[in-house]
């Protein structure tokens, strides 16, 4: 027979284990607790880790089910180049200034030739002299990732103000400092020094045909990793927090949050998260720096459960199609875990 003290200790240990299991909700970088469906959530984490471990480069994943508070965080505090994902921060500060009365969504900005940016979106292909509203520019910035619209808005708001607002929200690693034109000048100037001070309309007409794809990609990679310039910086966890505020109606205000989400639902770049999803509502924003970086972030509603998902990549070695597919598979695994439908070509 066991000693009574040993039996009491065993019972106490069992009670503490039961309490710990019931209270723990998250699976973070070093926290392997769970909610009620521990084994299932751990299984999803292992599937995501498998994609990440076989990814030829760096990958960070942050996922949170806002209905259950279940959370998975893989390398989620590491700062990455966001590329156009930072446009969500610009959108947030834009709505912050709108609601403070500094500007109106109906205000107009007249485009000039100098505002043109390397092909992204649609404005570069249209004649200067248009006068889109600020809401029009916001929409173009999000759904077509238009860099001309982005610089027009960021110049209007002030990039320091965008960063300051992110910091005020508690997102200390989220920042924007340089314009798209700064970035393009640095990249193109690596290929041809005359473009280091080029005007916008000159960058649009850069003679890429004079250079091999390898030369262009080498210059692009140099600009990302060695030139001391960035389009945007953040972590997957911080962008996840920004999206969570948006989903709960607490980013600036309920009206502002809903407006940004409604625009994100009209996203035109759908080669990542939506790739394998079927009949699923999604609001998302991509960030493009192929073949080295392809990011996607957003909110996916699965059976009325809003799920925040953020995937950042970096230093990818391989083709763009494979890069996009790895990001798409992350979203597919998350959606399948929560009972959502996938397309028949997902394996």
Predicted regions and their residues:
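Bacterial N-terminal signal peptides that target proteins for export
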Residues: 1-11
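Alpha-helix boundary/capping residues
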Residues: 14, 144, 169, 246, ...
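Bacterial N-terminal signal peptides
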Residues: 10-20
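A short small-residue
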Residues: 70, 125-127, 221-224, 312-313
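Active-site-proximal helix/loop microenvironment
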Residues: 81, 175-252
């Amino acid at each position: 027979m066991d000693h009574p003290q040993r039996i009491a200790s065993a019972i106490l240990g069992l009670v503490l284990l039961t309490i710990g299991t019931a209270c723990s909700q998250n699976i973070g970088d070093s926290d392997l607790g769970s909610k009620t469906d521990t084994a299932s959530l751990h299984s999803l984490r292992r599937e995501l880790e498998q994609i990440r471990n076989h990814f030829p480069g760096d990958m960070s994943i942050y996922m949170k089910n806002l209905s259950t508070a279940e959370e998975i965080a893989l390398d989620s505090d590491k700062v990455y180049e966001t590329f156009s994902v930072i446009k969500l921060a610009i959108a947030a500060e834009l709505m912050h200034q709108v609601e403070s009365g500094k500007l109106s969504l109906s205000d107009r900005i007249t485009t000039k030739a100098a505002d043109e940016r390397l092909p992204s979106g649609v404005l570069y292909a249209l004649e200067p002299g248009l006068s889109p509203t600020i809401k029009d520019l916001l929409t173009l910035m999000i759904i077509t990732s238009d860099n001309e619209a982005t610089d027009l808005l960021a110049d209007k708001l002030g990039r320091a103000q965008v960063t300051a607002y992110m910091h005020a929200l508690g997102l200390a690693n989220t920042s924007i400092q340089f314009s798209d034109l700064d970035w393009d000048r640095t990249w193109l100037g690596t290929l041809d020094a005359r473009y280091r001070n080029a005007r916008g309309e000159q960058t649009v007409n850069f003679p890429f045909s004079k250079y091999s794809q390898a030369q262009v990609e080498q210059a692009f990679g140099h600009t990302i990793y060695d030139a001391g310039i960035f389009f945007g910086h953040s972590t997957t966890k911080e962008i996840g927090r920004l999206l969570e505020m948006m989903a709960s109606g607490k980013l600036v205000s309920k009206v502002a949050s809903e407006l940004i989400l409604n625009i994100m639902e009209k996203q035109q770049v759908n080669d990542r998260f939506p790739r394998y999803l079927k009949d699923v509502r999604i609001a998302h924003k991509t960030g493009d720096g192929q073949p080295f970086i392809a990011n996607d972030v957003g909110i996916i509603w699965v059976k009325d459960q809003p799920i925040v998902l953020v995937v950042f990549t970096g230093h990818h070695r391989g083709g763009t199609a494979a890069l996009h597919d790895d990001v798409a598979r992350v979203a597919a695994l998350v959606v399948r875990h929560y009972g959502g439908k996938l397309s028949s070509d997902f394996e």
